[in-house]
Amino acid sequence: MRTLLPSHTPATVTTAARRRHVIHCAGKRSDSFSINSSSSDWQSSCAILSSKVNSQEQSESLSSNSNGSSSYHVSAVNGHNNGAGVSDLNLVPFNNNQSIQSKKPLSISDLSPAPMHGSNLRVAYQGVPGAYSEAAAGKAYPNCQAIPCDQFEVAFQAVELWIADRAVLPVENSLGGSIHRNYDLLLRHRLHIVGEVQLPVHHCLIALPGVRKEFLTRVISHPQGLAQCEHTLTKLGLNVAREAVDDTAGAAEFIAANNIRDTAAIASARAAEIYGLEILEDGIQDDASNVTRFVMLAREPIIPRTDRPFKTSIVFAHEKGTCVLFKVLSAFAFRNISLTKIESRPNHNVPIRLVDEANVGTAKHFEYMFYIDFEASMAESRAQNALSEVQEFTSFLRVLGSYPMDMTSWSPSSSSSSSSTFSL
């Protein structure tokens, strides 16, 4: 995927009190949270990071007296030091007018947990202001402090490092299907699903003021945004190239920042308002009932209950491949547990296997991880018994979370519903 968003200088961590932050990840992590890691892994990592920041803060306070510097370098992430794989976080503060403010060092209070509820809850999401993920964060946690992140994995890291208390990330769309990247990240990281929210999506074709759609040569947006508007773009008779970028609002920001007049973006009406663009076509999604499902992630799971509808998400694998899937499904069917989703993803640890169990021959099958959502709480005995039976057939089983279902009613998306603002 080609990223058109401007890059930022890595290797610094800065903040501004009581402001939102943009988190940028430079480089790749050399160590990720594996399947078999425990919750103590990230707890100890956060403690190590806090200790390093505290010691560096003392040393930098001495040097700042001589050179006036107000930022410093965090040389380790997740407690892992040195090496080319070190990943740095670059926090760029900004206010509602999108202007960069004076930088201040990141304090230990920024790595401490925020209250569970209320206006101080810090919620990470992927994208920039105006993204649908920001709207989902506002719907899930009204009056929260939104923390934009440039990549999905950075949102996971923000919660693991206590920079954010929650992350709100999309997992599937009613038109575009599953966001496979986030399913892989759910397995790689040790965060827990603590809730879900369904957001109606209302796409607009937006461009700089005065631009006519007849003169467009390119349309940019998130891959899901392009897929959800493919037929409508064709019906409009636009002979344009489709180009994927990291997020919908980021596409609008890129056009505005670079004054590009031959390119339009697929984004929300709020993104057009934020970045000073005009709406050329309104409601261009192929289906008016376009909904994206987001999950809320936290460091600790919530306590399952039975006083309201709950949903549980699991992931499992078996060394014999798909032949056990029928047995797994039967464990839920016999207990009248409804499944709402089944998703298969290649097993990265064992990508392929020989058909012959004696490891001879050339024919090969893919190994898969299976993600399942079912309508039951882990506080119910039928759910516990079902998973006990599933565990007999699988070589790996993990509960990603048991959480309240989003039962709010919604109607086909409209401009008013999508462009509403949130106190973030």
Swiss-Prot record:
Biased amino acid composition, Low complexity: 57-71
Domain ACT: 313-404
Major enzyme class: lyase
Pathway(s) per entry: Amino-acid biosynthesis; L-phenylalanine biosynthesis; L-phenylalanine from L-arogenate: step 1/1
Residue ranges annotated for the Prephenate dehydratase domain, each copy included: 122-299
Pfam families: PDT
GO molecular function, one term: arogenate dehydratase activity
Main subcellular location: plastid
Domain of life of the organism encoding this protein: Eukaryota
Knockout or disruption consequences: Lack of Phe and Tyr accumulation after blue light irradiation of etiolated seedlings.
GO biological process terms, semicolon-separated: L-phenylalanine biosynthetic process; response to low fluence blue light stimulus by blue low-fluence system; tyrosine biosynthetic process
Enzyme Commission code: 4.2.1.91
Tissue specificity remark: Expressed in roots, leaves, stems, flowers and siliques.
Protein name (Swiss-Prot/TrEMBL): Arogenate dehydratase 3, chloroplastic
